[in-house]
Amino acid sequence: MSIDMDYMAGEEFITAEELGQELAAFFGLSAGDTVPERVSEQVVVFGGVFEPVGFLVFHIVRKGGMYPGVYESAILKRDFPYEQSVSFRLDKERNIPETLNVVLRFVCHLFRKYPVNALLEVLDRDECLFEKESGKICLRPGSDCFSPETLRACGIEALRAGAGEH
């Protein structure tokens, strides 16, 4: 069994090769450890390497693909159109709270290096909003899936109820 997390970006921001390099650098791996297995033009899978952490990474370009490219966002209270997503499949047999925090730290690293308007959807209920112009990362009110230490380390602020509507 698994849980999926999706980092959905309003524009294409990273190639599969760049994502492999970022995974290697962030997790201290050699470049050979992050060679993707291409599934199609729109899905690139990086897997197996992250077994100790407990997740697989999917680099998915959904533009023109089988997905609509629109996410119904609770934090924005409207649809969020996206061009690209990086998806994480977490193994439920592992330490899910720890894995969620590791993935959030990696996504924040990606955002700092490749700023883009984006949403991170977690467990079908929690969302983080990434704002390109301001550089802010905001967490949906009432979210409880990340540790306070990770939120502080990533510079994430919790939105007040009703905030985030654009």
Give residue spans per PLM region.
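Residues in well-ordered beta-strands of folded domains
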Residues: M8, S87-R89, E121
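Charged, amphipathic alpha-helical segments and their flanking helix caps
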Residues: M8-E11, T15-E17, Q21, I96-V116
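Acidic, proline/glycine-rich low-complexity IDRs
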Residues: D4, R105-H166
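Short, extreme N-terminal segment that most often corresponds to the first beta-strand
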Residues: M1-E41, V45-G47, A163-H166
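Non-membrane alpha-helical secondary structure
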Residues: E11, T15, P52, V102, ...
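Hydrophobic beta-strand residues in large extracellular and virion-surface proteins
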Residues: L23, F58, V86-F88, V103, ...
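Short, intrinsically disordered low-complexity segments
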Residues: L29-P97
